[in-house]
Amino acid sequence: MKKLPLTDSAWLTMESDTTPMHVGSLQLFELPNNAPDDYLQQLMQRWLTFDEPQPPFNQKLVYPLKGLKQPHWDTDTEFDIGYHVRHSALPRPGRVRELLVLVSRLHGSLLDRSRPMWELHLIEGLEGKRFAIYTKMHHSVVDGMAGMRLLQSSLSERADQLDQPPPWAMQRAPKKPSKRSPAEAGEEAAATALPKQMLGNLAGNAGSIPALISGGRKSLGADRKIKAVAPYQAPKSLINQRVSKARRFVAESYSLERIKAIGKQHGATVNDIVMAMCAGALRRYLSEHDALPDKPLIGDAPVSIRPADQAEAGGNAISIILMDLATNEADPLKRLARIRESMQAGKDKLGAMSRKQILNYTTLVMLPFTIGQLIGTAGRVRPMFNLVISNVPGPKKSLYLNGARMQGMYPVSLLFNGQALNVTVTSYVDSLDFGVIACRRSLPQVQRLLDHLEASLAELEARN
C-alpha cells in the first residue's frame, strides 16, 4: 500500500456532486489513409487485451476501518478493463459540436471511488474521417501536467509504429536516484510536512497554524519590494458563482507562429499573449452581459514545481502566480503591458524563494480557499481570484496512435464553487489548443468566448 499524501487527498475532500475533482483531455485523430472500415473496432479489441494495468492506473483508494486516518492507494485485484475503457459513437452529422456536447456530459459525472479513478472513451463518428479520445483522471492521482505526460507516453513520433501499448499498460521507468543533497531533501521534507499537518486535521492541530503563518511570512519576507498581486484582491463577478453539475466544454486551436509573431511585434512572450487574449475575451464577454466589474479580474496561473526527472510521476506539484488581467483597461496594448508587468512580478516572487518557501507560501495562500470549499462560503464571499488560466507546454513533434496522426489535444479542467470558468491551453507542434470549461447554468453562451479570443488576438495583431 502507498499512503496518499494529505496534499493530494485535499482534492478528495473538496469533491462533491457539483464539483468533480478530475482533469481530462480531448485528443483528435485523423484515420490513416489505408485504415480498414473496422479500424476502431480492432483498436478497441486490442486495447481490451491489456487488462493488467500499471500504476497509477491500477491503484484504488482504500480507507482504514478505524479512526480518521488518511486513505491509501492499493492495487485493484479485481480490475475490470471493460469498465474503464469505453467505446462511443457520435450522432450524425458528427460535427465537433456533437463531440463537445458529449465531452461536456462525460466530464460532469463523478469517477467511482471504489475503482481506480480514471476512464478512457474511444469516440467514433467524427466528420472528416476522424475519431477522438476523451480521458479523465482524478486530480488526487495526477496534476494536469503529469496526466498529459502519461497520455503522451502511449503515442509515437513514428506513423508506422503499430504496436504501442495504451497508456495504462506502459511500463514506467524506475525513478532515478535523487540528485539533491541531504540538506535539500530534508528541506523539502520539512516543507511538505507542514501542509500535511494543516490539511490533515485542522481542528486537531490548531497549534500548527502559527508555524504555517510564520513560515509563509518568511517565504514572503525576501521579496516585499516585488509588486506582485496579493490574494483576495479580486472583485466579485459573474464568473464567481456557485456551480451546478452540468458542464459546457468548448475548444479551439490557434496558430503558434501567429501568436509568436504578435508577441515579437509587442516585445511579449507567447504566455503574455495567451493571457492578453483571455483578458480581452473576458472583457468582451462580461460587457455583453452588462457584468464587467470596475476593478480588474485577477487570474490564477498554476506553475509546475515538479523536478524535470519526475515528469510522469503521480501526485501534485504545483504553485500559483496571481496576475492582474487588466480587464478594466479598454486599450489592448496598455492591457498587455499591465499583464506582462504583473506576470513578471509573480515570477520574481517565486524566483526569490527556495522550494521549501514555495511550498509554505502555496499552502498558506490556498488554505483559506480550501476551507471555503469545505464550509460552503465559496461563491458567496469575495474570491481569492476570479479564474484559473493554465498554459501547459506540449509535444513539439507530431504524434501518432497506431498510425493515426493526432490533430489536436485539448485540456478539460475542473471547476470549484466560486470558480465557474477555467481556461487551459496546451501547445502541440505548430498550434495552441484552448480548452474552456464552464458551469452550464452560471455562464450562458460560453462558446462566445471563442469568438472573443479571436477578436482579442486580431486586435493585438492590428496594433503597431
Can you describe what each PLM-predicted range is?
Residues M1-H22:
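Generic start-of-chain signal for non-secretory N-termini
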Residues M1-T7, L26-D38, M44-Q419, V423-E454, ...:
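Soluble acyl-CoA-dependent acyltransferase catalytic core bearing the H(X)4D motif
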